[in-house]
Amino acid sequence: MNYITFPTAQSAVEKIAQEFVIYSQANHPVHISLSGGSTPKLLFKTLAQAPYADAINWKNLHFWWGDDRMVSPTDPESNYGEVQKLLFDHINIPAENIHRIRGENEPHLELKRFEEELSAVISDGVFDWIILGMGADGHTASLFPNQTNFADENLAVIAKHPESGQFRISKTAKLIEQAKRITYLVTGEGKAEILKEIQTTPAENLPYPAAKIQAKNGVTEWYLDKAAAKLL
């Protein structure tokens, strides 16, 4: 497990924000996939403020999501809605650079539409950077233990939360693994035990998608705060 430990969650998201600045200076479109969850909210708030809001050339960055819940963008559960509220409403970014999963649509129709958009915009299926979180059960995006097909050749999949039954659309494991770079952003002592397990046990012996999904031809790294890394 290739990991970097930061003193706090804030210092981890500052590092990611600094890298957004660097990515945005490339003179070509850069495709970044975002994650939902509490730590990414910290990232979006940080990006919306000085110095990052002005230092980033937003027109070069295209944003996607690892997954989203099938709810309206105004619903508090919407991953896209959180980013809109915390970041997009505060910066000048072209509307065509935002590639959201339309959670208000019927799931099967939206799956088809989203896959078509992915194919049209990123024809080789290779994202520049995919930022992922990890749940306490080891899920990532909406790829859950014991129900993820790691061989699924599609670009996206309809997933169902194992407890709530809520529908989501998620990138598939295979699409994520094509990325040039995958960064798992994991914070808080609630994740310490599972991180220790991932570090000490071969991925094939674990049920956790976050342990198994790694960039095939790129870099996979874990950004952890001190609390999450305390058992490593």
Region roles according to the model:
Residues 1-32:
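N-terminal glycine-/serine-/threonine-rich phosphate-binding loop
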Residues 26-51:
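Glycine-rich N-terminal segment of FAD-binding domains in flavoprotein oxidoreductases
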Residues 34-39, 132-136, 187:
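Glycine-rich beta-strand-to-loop/alpha-helix junction loops that act as flexible
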Residues 46-56, 81, 145-153, 201:
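A glycine- and small-aliphatic-rich helix-loop capping segment at beta-alpha/alpha-beta transitions
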Residues 56-128:
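Ligand-binding beta-strand-loop-alpha-helix segment within the catalytic cores
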Residues 111-112, 141-146, 194-198:
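A short secondary-structure junction signal
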Residues 130-174:
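Class I SAM-dependent methyltransferase SAM-binding "motif I" and its flanking Rossmann-like core
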Residues 180-232:
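ATP/nucleoside-binding phosphotransfer catalytic cores, i.e., glycine-rich phosphate-binding loops
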